[in-house]
């Protein structure tokens, strides 16, 4: 008994002795987690400081005596507005600020009107009329929140409308200064909302539209990364490291990105024109592209199942389809990288994308030829090659899906006014033309051959661009369709 008591006592003192070191380790671990969280997105720290600035500015309604005399305790509504309205992005702040401002204005006006209307029915009829109006408008506003469009863009405004109307209408029954109360509430909310919007826009703004733009381009890059590493994943899995394998599977995050994309697109519509994005930028087109990207990610997820499966086709069959499969995955990956770069830089590079897609289609034809030449002779052979054939068919679907993504981006680029990238063929001709002008070129004039000695050598170069009909731009740059030069 004494031994157990001594052991418990020793254990207690040991825990007490270890407590400072454990506390230090725990605090250090938490500090490192906070530092890592802040480094992942430094804008979070800036946003926190911006909220602090907005709260400090709006608190002047209490600190400055003339402002306090004007607004009194209703200045608290301005502080409350800053807390609930200030969002991480400019679009989020504008959405909540404008919703709150207009909802307060409309609900306040209706509330004052409801109070004056109810007073016509006398002291006994006034609460009955107010109760009917509060019930009717409150129920109607609540029902409107179920409509998808209102739910998506004006849900917060409908909520504030219900709150403000009920507050003004019910308070008006016990006070005669209903107009003053409504004015002070509206004024302080507008002051708080305006401060939020100004701080959000002019101090290190975070644009939802820019985040959406980068997100779509990065998601397309994730698809490209997987397709470029597909050959090694499927045909040579033993040579792929764990880090590389996890890197190429980044596409999995695309499968759960729909809610984030919808939210960013909705907030981006509230934002004014900024940077490369004009006032009426086609934000809805991002959702169309995102849907196709997600569809492609679903195909890759199915494809990844065959990569991880132990049920593979015979080695002889895989060796026949390896070359077209490799070409197909590599080319379609390059096409996706070009599309992602086009979105990031907002430059239309259709020639490069078309070239890679055409190459992938040629690889599909070669794959079909290889499959026909490997037609199984027996039922058993057919069962053995099914995994390989299924994998190939899914990869063909991926190519078709990438082509749809490109078509959607091509449509989007016209609406978003992407800059045109100079065609590669025209660029080569321009470079050759400029090179000729830098060298020593002596033109051949009529009659020169008669004057000069017959032993002199001339090389007459006549350039006919037969296979290429120059556009108006090409003619302006190159000067003419036919060039005659003499190299001495």
Swiss-Prot record:
It is a multi-pass membrane protein. The keyword Membrane applies. GO terms for cellular component: membrane. The chain crosses the membrane at residues 45-64, 66-86, 101-121, 127-147, 160-180, 189-209. Keywords: Ion channel, Ion transport, Membrane, Transmembrane, Transmembrane helix, Transport. It is found in: Membrane. GO terms for biological process: malate transport; monoatomic ion transmembrane transport. The keyword Membrane applies. Disulfide bonds: none annotated. Malate transporter. Belongs to the aromatic acid exporter (TC 2.A.85) family. This is Aluminum-activated malate transporter 8. It comes from Arabidopsis thaliana.
